[in-house]
Amino acid sequence: MAASGDVGKLLQVQNGTPASTSYNGVDALHACNILQQLKALYDEAQLTDIVVEVDHGKTFSCHRNVLAAISPYFRSMFTSGLTESSQREVRIVGVESESMHLVLDYAYTSRVTLTESNVQALFTAASIFQIPALQDQCAQFMISRLDPQNCIGVFMFADAYGHQELRERSQDYIRKKFLCVMGEQEFLHLTKDQLVSILNSDDLNVEKEEHVYESIVHWLEYDCSRREADLPEVFAKCIRLPLLEEAFLSRIPPAFALALSRDSSDKSRLNGTNGCSQRLGMTASEMIICFDAAHKHSGKKQTVPCLDIAAGKVYKLCKPPNDLREVGILISSENDIFIAGGYRPSNSEVCIDHRAESDFWQYEHAGNRWLPRSPMLRARIGCRLVHCCGKLYALGGRVYEGDGRNALKSVECYDARDNCWTAVSPMPVAMEFHSTIEYKDRIYVLQGEYFFCFDPRKDYWGHLPSMNIPRTQGLAALHKNCIYYIAGICRNHQRTFTVEVYDIEQNTWCRKRDLPFDQATSPYIKVLLLQGRLHLFVRATQVMVEEHVFRTSRKNSLYQYDDEADHWTKVYETPDRLWDLGRHFECVVAKLYPQCLQKVL
């Protein structure tokens, strides 16, 4: 029988490598278990060796080694050899009791509970204790809660503590929402340097330089005696004189005109409009965005063309992530672009049962990219998105489940401040290819013989009179306080170009002249509001015979509606076949920034 040493040598020879004499194992749960036991000791006040007293005399018994491990502040205090290192109790000034409780909870559990009421005080405590990871969590929470009412306060707070990311993100938000923010009370409390930092940027979202001037005057008048001496410097650094209208300049009071004329040696303010860069908001152009368009040379590759009708140019928007198709689309009143749901195309040419997605994305104009937001509660294809009462609603759509294709009646609500969705009362019937309109804090939903009104504040659905010619897959638009319902498919499965108008205040329907299209061209129609007027974007197909060979030709055209004449006129035709539009293409109108997009034509 071989001795143990011989067996070891035999194994080395068989394996061809020296046998290992040690084993290095890692217990993945060890750190978590240690943390749990330390938390238990803290909760039971066992083996504690330091008492921390904060504002209002509140005390906390805890462990020096835990505090020193997460905080350089405490590590220095307990190891420096100073008086505090040997004291049983230490007092911390400037930290609230709730904040200290949250810091200790974070130290012993790695978890933190943030609210709008505690986040700034906790950030302050984390700053004092030099815990950057906790500071960053607080900063991200504040960034996620930015709105026109609090962004100035957050910016000033970040500036005071020198947190670069929070300062930059809040400043970017102020510039983006400047017209809303400049009227807020906190705007008047900005320091001169903070005001200049915001106003001297190219990224300021204003359509006229006059808004910048007015905001400075508003800021000055709040504390004129102290700020008057700063006015020439603020004007010199922030106002771009060539961008001010001559008529506006002539109306400026003499004292302000004198301040504007000082520092006239600044060349950037005297070299004419051509040498003075425009603000971001001045470059915005209202464009038609076409979703679910196919690339000209490959039908499988999606592209998102943007038509600047006024300038006669074509741009390209960043396509939806994961090549999502048939998404719900919303352009908010603040020009934010959202997409939700849809499906990812299959590699199979014959697959029609697409898997619904719950993804939710917001478009970032400056970066021409899509930013992820919290996904919907329910995956859905072709849902409708509506902004109402400060929140976003996703209604209906379809999924492929169980016995096949199923329409949905569920509705959910998105709160941007909390970045979360909640379910609300479902629609009375399941719907897909329906139309939704928001008007005076109500959501109107139309499909076939169904016409409903939803009150978000009461979470209640009401019934309204159906249209005269019920039809599905029609198109709805709000124009002059009326809902225009255009085209669709009748009960006999025939397409119709009927136009009906619902007067919301009068609660009545009336007919308008039918659309001037030929059934033979198989037009696919989308309704738009462009420059305040009702338009139709139409994809029409023509069949031509050339030397006994049938050829098809598609044209994409824009028609404008004349309210008084009740007449549609073609006003634009897209460049020939830059892309292909399928049956499920969608068109929306939004203000976009050409310099942020890829130019196509």
Swiss-Prot record:
Entries under InterPro entries matching the protein: BACK, BTB-kelch_protein, BTB/POZ_dom, BTB/POZ_KBTBD8, Kelch-typ_b-propeller, Kelch_1, SKP1/BTB/POZ_sf
Any one GO BP annotation for this protein: neural crest cell development
Cellular component GO terms, alphabetical: Cul3-RING ubiquitin ligase complex; cytoplasm; Golgi apparatus; spindle
GO molecular function: ubiquitin-like ligase-substrate adaptor activity
SMART domains the UniProt entry points to: BACK (SM00875), BTB (SM00225), Kelch (SM00612)
Subcellular location per the Swiss-Prot or TrEMBL entry: Cytoplasm, Cytoskeleton, Spindle; Golgi apparatus
Pfam families found in the cross-reference section: BACK, BTB, Kelch_1
Every BACK domain range: 151-253
Keywords, in A-Z order: Cytoplasm, Cytoskeleton, Golgi apparatus, Kelch repeat, Repeat, Translation regulation, Ubl conjugation pathway
Job description of the protein: Substrate-specific adapter of a BCR (BTB-CUL3-RBX1) E3 ubiquitin ligase complex that acts as a regulator of neural crest specification. The BCR(KBTBD8) complex acts by mediating monoubiquitination of target proteins.
Record protein name field: Kelch repeat and BTB domain-containing protein 8
The species this protein was found in: Danio rerio (Zebrafish)
Top-level taxonomy: Eukaryota, Metazoa, Chordata, Craniata, Vertebrata
